[in-house]
Amino acid sequence: MASIRELHQQLIKKERSAVEITTEALDRIEKLEPLLHSFLHITADQALESAKKVDAKIAAKEEIGLLEGIPVGIKDNMCTQGIPTTCGSKILENFVPPYESTVTQKLKDSGAITLGKTNLDEFAMGSSTESSGYQVTANPWDLSRVPGGSSGGSAAAVASEECVVALGSDTGGSIRQPASYCGVVGLKPTYGLVSRFGLVAYASSLDQIGPFARTVEDAAILLGAIAGYDPKDSTSLNVEIPDYTQFLKPKLSKLKIGIIKETFGEGLDPVVADTVNQGVEQLKKLGAKVKEISCPRFRYGLPAYYIIAPSEASANLARYDAVKYGIRKEADTLMSMYTTTRASGFGAEVKRRIMLGTYALSAGYYDAYYLKAQKVRTLIKQDFEQAFEEVDVLVCPTAPTTAFKAGEKTDDPLSMYLSDLMTIPVNLGGLPGMSIPCGFDRLGLPIGMQLISNVLREDLLFQVAYAYEQATDWHKRKPPLPQ
C-alpha cells in the first residue's frame, strides 16, 4: 500500500477513489486476518460510508486534507463511540463507549478512515500481545513469533499493509518495541503532547498515544493530526504544534548524537548491537558528530518502572467493579460480585500487576518501594538532562533481541519484562522516543534503532530518522506474506 502523500495524490488526481482504497485495505484484512489476528473489531460498513463522503467532496471539487480517505487502525484501548472498546480484556467484552476519545475524534475530523480496532495485551500490560483475552497476534515476518507488545496488533497491521498507519499507546515501550519487532516506524511523543482523554488508563503518569507508520513522513503527518492541547486532559501541554514534515531533511550536519554506553552491555544480542552500530556509522556519514554518553542510572529503569506502573494500575483498575459497565458475575453479596467478576474478567498478567502495585502501595512498604522508585525516576531524568547538555539526540537499540517465539516467555514474567529494558527509561523521563528499522538478523527478523530527544524536541527525531531512512532501504522491505 502506498504512503499517505502518494495516496493523497492519487485521490486528488482521481486515479483512485477513497472507496477503492478502503475496499483494497478491507480485502487485505480479510485475506491476512486468519494468519495475523491483528484486529479485534473490523468496522467495514462505517469505513466505506466515510470513504463515500471523501469521494463526494472530491466530486464536488472541494479540497481534501492529507489524511482524508487514508485507512487507519486504532488500538483497542482508545474509546470509539458506538464501536466496542475491550482493551483486550474479557471484563470489557460488552463495552461500547458512549463517547469518543480526543485522538479518534481528531482522526474523524481529519477525514481518516477507521478500519477497526487492533489487538493488544490486556489493558496494555505486556510485551508480546499474548496476554490479550481474545487472540494472539502473529509477527508478519515470522508467524511463529510475537509482534511485540502491548500495541502488537497495530504494529502487525501496519507492517503487513492491512492499513497505512495506526495508533498505539506507549507506557514502557508499547509502541517502540513492537515497531522494532515488526520493522516499522513507531513514535512515543513527549508526555502530554497528545491527549489521553478517552485512552483507557494503565499507568497515567507514563501512558502516551503515538503513531505507527511504514515511513517517517507518514509518522510525522499522523502525529501532526493527533497532537495538541486538550482541556479534557489535565496533563495536556498547551504548546504550539508545528508541521512536523518541515523537519524532514536529508542531512545531519552539526547535529550531535550520543550513544548510550549502558545499553550495549549484558543481555544485548550481539547481532542487534552490530546492526545498531552500523546504523550509527550511517549517521556519521550523513554529517552527525557522534560520541559515547553515560546514563549510569538507566539500568535502574526496569525495577523502578515495575513498581510505579503496577502501583498506578492497581488504582486505575479498581474502577472495574461490574456496577456500571463491563461484564457482571451474579453473586449473593455486593462484595462477592466484585471479587467473582474481577477474578473471572481479568487475566493472569493483569492480576499479577494489580497485586504488585497493591503491595508496593501498602502501608508497610510504601517508603521502601513506591517512594524509592519515584526517587530513582528523578535520578534517571537527571541523567537525561545531563546527556542533553552535551548532545541533541541519544541513540541505542530499541530492544535487546529480535522477536521471540510465541509461548517462549509466557511462563517467565521477568524474561518478558526485560524486552522493554531499553524503552522504559524514556517513559520515566517523559521524553519522546522513536524506533526506526535499521536492519535484519540472520533469520530475516527486523531490528530497530531507538532515537531519544529532549522534551518537545520531536523535530530532532524526525530530522535524524528521515535522513537515515533516505540513505537506507530497510523500510522498503516487506514481510513474506500473500500480496
UniProtKB/Swiss-Prot annotation:
Record-linked InterPro entries: Amidase, Amidase_CS, Amidase_dom, AS_sf, GatA
PANTHER family the UniProt entry points to: GLUTAMYL-TRNA(GLN) AMIDOTRANSFERASE SUBUNIT A, TRANSAMIDASE
A family per Pfam: Amidase
Keyword Nucleotide-binding attributed: yes
Keyword Nucleotide-binding: yes
Subunit structure: Heterotrimer of A, B and C subunits.
Similarity remark: Belongs to the amidase family. GatA subfamily.
A GO BP annotation: translation
NCBIfam families in the cross-refs: gatA
Residues at the catalytic site: 75 (charge relay system), 150 (charge relay system), 174 (acyl-ester intermediate)
GO cellular component labels: glutamyl-tRNA(Gln) amidotransferase complex
Protein role: Allows the formation of correctly charged Gln-tRNA(Gln) through the transamidation of misacylated Glu-tRNA(Gln) in organisms which lack glutaminyl-tRNA synthetase. The reaction takes place in the presence of glutamine and ATP through an activated gamma-phospho-Glu-tRNA(Gln).
GO molecular function: ATP binding; glutaminyl-tRNA synthase (glutamine-hydrolyzing) activity
EC number assigned by the record: 6.3.5.7
Catalytic activity: L-glutamyl-tRNA(Gln) + L-glutamine + ATP + H2O = L-glutaminyl-tRNA(Gln) + L-glutamate + ADP + phosphate + H(+)
Keywords, comma-separated and alphabetical: ATP-binding, Ligase, Nucleotide-binding, Protein biosynthesis
Protein name stated in the entry: Glutamyl-tRNA(Gln) amidotransferase subunit A
Stored HAMAP family: GatA (MF_00120)
